[in-house]
Regions:
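Hydrophobic residues embedded in beta-strands of well-ordered beta-sheets
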Residues: 14, 26-27, 140, 150, ...
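Short, surface-exposed alpha-helical segments at coil->helix boundaries
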Residues: 87-94, 484
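Short secondary-structure junctions
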Residues: 448-454, 493-496
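A structural preference for short, hydrophobic beta-strand core positions in alpha/beta folds
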Residues: 78, 107, 288, 500-501
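Short, non-transmembrane amphipathic alpha-helical segments
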Residues: 476-497
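N-terminal glycine/serine-rich phosphate-binding loop of ATP-dependent small-molecule kinases
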Residues: 1-5, 9-15, 19-80, 91-105
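Ser/Thr-glycine-rich phosphate-binding loops at phosphate-binding pockets of nucleotides
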Residues: 11-13, 121, 135-142, 208
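Helical "lid/coupling" subdomains associated with nucleotide-phosphate turnover
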Residues: 4, 18, 42-66, 86-87, ...
Length: 501
């Protein structure tokens, strides 16, 4: 396992990320530090990055360099926001950085920015057609794609920071918000293709301003799980947030407590941009992505087949989780046994194919709770799944999988706990969780020694008895003995006796 450092010089902050990655292309962020440095402040006045900002940047980079050296991290990716390309002293600035800390930064081109965002979405969303909207500090990018092909793209030279600065003299908050929306709308209307989108194009919001807005939406609706990626910001929910922001005292010295460390006036301008998007792209919701430029650049650096769209996004993210937090068992074998049982018991559980993805997540992470404690690891697994980066699945599927893992132990099912998630889960889901929980538990018991002794299972139903016949390649007496411990749970859930041979 190797380590990689990624440093981004943004328009308003410098981000240092430390990642772990493996030779087979899995990576995860181990540490991330963000420090506010407004590099582009007053840049439009004379075209120069100010010396005080340069000194502040280099002082910070010296610290990051020491951190890298202390851990022996030699591999790094260093890049700067394209907006810095407008600075007259950009080359002198980057040259001074290299001479001082031996870090070679390059300013991303718009093409590289588009490529990174496109690749990040291909690796974290299963959508065939998408519209990526990224809001930065001093710019925004909009990209339309169909699979691996970018169809249209545009760069708008206003982001949340410089939009807030443009209208800082407007004192009435409601009037200011409406003026910002009108201004961004005028920019969007210069791109005719934005108004010719097909209905099945999914809108994906990227960046800290979408994340802050998503956090506001989740808090306002008391959304029961705190997962940002793939969260849907609905038009209806967003309208209430926009209306609320217009009534607040928005000041650049203030912050929205519990929402973001960003200045409140900048969050408000970001929300104004999103309002303009909702007004013009005619979409009922925008899906939030936590995988932006950095994710795409790292994927391009590490993954040998980054040119190709990832065909199995969910499989990749589950494999990555198990790669960095191994359980000591072959999780693929447990999943294979779960699928066999799911098919063989179909006449009993009567669940459709929509539950297969839930089964895949829960079977792949059924032992994940042991990272916290072996005692009631099934219940611990609930929180582990909700805290893991799982891509290619909806919040409903992830939450269902968490409940399935917890309900490997049937005593863990609590109706009062279940009711907390009623806005995401349906009435029929409780029964499905109990059935899938038993299937996953049975699969883990049939692989209890980790020797992959059980290769196949056939099912016969004779009256009130279900007979599971195992096909084995070695001694599986312990596996069968352990599997017999769930006979009473099987009877309770499926209403039939179970025999395992």
């Amino acid at each position: 396992m190797e380590k990689l450092a990624v440093i981004e010089l943004g328009a308003s902050e410098i981000t240092f990320s430390k990642l772990k990655f493996t030779s087979n292309g899995f990576f995860m962020i181990e540490q991330q530090i963000k420090e506010p440095v407004r590099l582009t402040q007053d840049l439009e006045r004379d075209g120069y990055i100010k010396s005080a900002r340069i000194e502040e940047t280099i002082s910070l980079l010296k610290i990051f360099r020491k951190m890298m050296d202390s851990e022996g991290i030699s591999m790094h990716v260093c890049y700067a926001d394209p907006v810095l390309s407008t600075a007259r002293n950009q080359l002198a600035f980057l040259d001074e950085i290299y001479k001082t800390v031996s870090l070679h930064f390059r300013i991303l081109t718009f093409d590289e920015q588009v490529d990174a965002l496109h690749l990040a979405c291909l690796h974290s969303f299963p959508n065939i057609k998408g519209l990526i909207c990224q809001i930065n500090d001093d710019s925004m990018q909009i990209i339309q794609y169909n699979r691996r092909t970018v169809l249209n793209r545009c760069n708008i030279s206003f982001g949340a920071y410089n939009l807030a600065e443009k209208f800082e003299n407007v004192t009435d908050v409601s009037q200011k918000m409406d003026k910002m929306v009108d201004f961004i709308t005028a920019q969007l209307r210069q791109e005719k293709w934005l108004f010719e989108l097909e209905e099945d194009v999914e809108c994906i919001g990227v960046g800290k301003f979408f994340e802050a807005t998503g956090s506001l939406c989740r808090k306002s609706t008391h959304y029961p799980i705190d997962i940002a990626h793939n969260y849907e910001i609905t038009d209806a929910n967003f309208k209430s947030i926009y209306g609320l922001i217009k009534t607040l005292d928005i000041d650049k010295a203030k912050k929205l407590k519990g929402i973001s460390n960003l200045p409140a006036n900048v969050v408000a301008s970001g929300i104004a941009i999103i309002k303009a998007l909702f007004n013009n792209i005619s979409k009922a919701h925008i899906k939030l992505s936590t995988c932006g430029e950095m994710y795409g650049l790292v994927a391009r650096t590490i993954l040998s087949q980054a040119e190709k769209p990832m065909l199995d996004i969910l499989g990749y993210s589950l494999s990555a989780v198990n790669e960095f937090y191994p359980s000591g068992q072959d999780m693929n074998n447990i999943y294979d046994l779960s699928i066999i049982l799911y098919k063989q018991l179909k006449i009993l559980h009567r669940l459709n194919r929509n539950y297969v993805k839930i089964l895949r997540i829960s079977a792949s992470m059924c032992l994940s709770g042991k990272r916290i404690s072996f005692n009631n690891y099934e219940k611990n697994g609930f929180n582990v799944i909700l805290g893991s980066n799982i891509y290619g699945a909806t919040h409903h599927e992830i939450l269902m999988a968490a409940f399935v893992v917890a309900n490997q132990n049937s005593d863990n099912f609590s109706l009062s706990e279940w009711v907390r998630y009623k806005d995401i889960l349906g009435e029929e889901d409780a029964s499905a969780v109990k059935k899938l929980g038993l299937i996953v538990k049975l699969a883990t018991l049939l692989n209890v020694t980790g020797s992959n002794a059980v290769k196949d299972i056939a099912c016969d139903i004779l009256g009130d008895t279900v007979i599971l016949k195992t096909a084995v390649e070695k001694d599986a007496s312990l596996e069968i003995s352990q599997a017999q411990t769930i006979y009473s749970d099987f009877k309770k859930i499926f209403g039939k006796n179970l025999q395992i041979l």
